[in-house]
């Protein structure tokens, strides 16, 4: 199950796109029977969260807050929360030439990859789908591809 909490107005068509992308990525990881929450916020909120939890005073596109520790024998029904800044996602979507809806859906797959226990080197501003390389990035590329294939093509 995918819950969406919109603290900022979501772009048109986001709910079905988010559901399709995350369902595909969850299936990819074998966690389609689990739950995640996606929270849409602005730069001010995500900046405050990043400062509080990571000690970095800057906005970002996506943060993940898992409800379990990788390696624990019990994976809870709710995997955690994915927080996405619509402001940052909007700038990235414009730079990449696709819709905000598509950007948010793909960022959610990145957040899910963290929720299931994967991490990557810090690479602020480097899109995981556009040049982040190395074995630690492959799982993020795979989840992004699963999500991308579930989305309808854009005009």
Swiss-Prot record:
GO-annotated molecular function: metalloendopeptidase activity; RNA endonuclease activity; zinc ion binding
Binding note for cofactor: Binds 1 zinc ion.
Enzyme Commission identifier(s): 3.1.-.-
Key words, A-Z: Cytoplasm, Endonuclease, Hydrolase, Metal-binding, Nuclease, Ribosome biogenesis, rRNA processing, Zinc
Binding residues annotated for Zn(2+), in chain numbering: 110, 114, 120
UniProt cross-references to SUPFAM superfamilies, sorted A to Z: Metalloproteases ('zincins'), catalytic domain
EC primary class: hydrolase
GO cellular component terms, A-Z: cytoplasm
Cofactor(s) needed by this chain: Zn(2+)
InterPro entries: MetalPrtase_cat_dom_sf_prd, YbeY, YbeY_CS
Chief localisation class: cytoplasm
Biological-process GO terms, alphabetical: rRNA processing
Cytoplasm keyword on record: yes
Residues spanning the signal sequence: none
Localisation: Cytoplasm
Family: Belongs to the endoribonuclease YbeY family.
Role: Single strand-specific metallo-endoribonuclease involved in late-stage 70S ribosome quality control and in maturation of the 3' terminus of the 16S rRNA.
Name of the protein this chain belongs to: Endoribonuclease YbeY
Organism annotation: Deinococcus geothermalis (strain DSM 11300 / CIP 105573 / AG-3a)
């Amino acid at each position: 199950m995918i819950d969406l909490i919109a603290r900022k107005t979501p772009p048109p068509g986001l709910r079905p796109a988010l559901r399709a992308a995350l369902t595909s990525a969850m299936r990819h990881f074998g966690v389609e029977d689990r739950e995640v929450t996606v929270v849409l916020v602005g730069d001010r909120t995500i900046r405050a969260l990043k400062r509080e939890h990571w000690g970095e005073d800057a906005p970002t596109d996506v943060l993940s807050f898992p409800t379990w520790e990788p390696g624990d024998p019990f994976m809870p029904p709710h995997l955690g929360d994915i927080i996405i800044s619509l402001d940052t996602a909007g700038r990235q979507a414009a730079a990449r030439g696709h819709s905000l809806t598509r950007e948010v859906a793909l960022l959610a797959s990145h957040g899910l990859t963290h929720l299931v226990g994967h991490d990557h080197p810090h690479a602020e501003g480097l899109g995981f789908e556009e040049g982040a390389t190395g074995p630690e990035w492959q799982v993020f590329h795979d989840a992004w591809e699963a999500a991308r294939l579930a989305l309808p093509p854009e005009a």
